[in-house]
């Protein structure tokens, strides 16, 4: 009887935590002034609300390499938490709808949207690190984007057997129903500093 009274609260807590994590991500809408004449918007995807791609505004590859390029370690992991997708009102895409509806426990994407100055270069610094007692996996890459006035972009970090990538697509204005298609956006990859992993 003692074992049951001890195990019952533990089992109940585990069951409730599973219900909590199976919920869809919350969309938090932020009121941010936006002028399509001289600004652009970015939706940057991450994991479990954590930034896998860091945006460095008003920066070229050269400026980034001097300051930010050397110090960047990002370990992802830890216990799952409530996921919030931060929106400034960008149009929906197939990817954003999929992320909004995701209820994954082991792996779940999230995003944050930003209003940025148009015509000024920024650097998208993507990194992912995992560490166990037997191995360390790290991959880092960076790319420069000069957002154009009134344009919307999506940014995603991806990994494969050959390395990693920061992919940038433009959200096209012609909607297909409620969803907007995307197309490739021009970026320039930054050389990695020698002191970076």
What kind of feature is each model-predicted range?
Residues 147:
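Short, acidic, Ser/Thr-enriched surface-loop or helix-capping motifs
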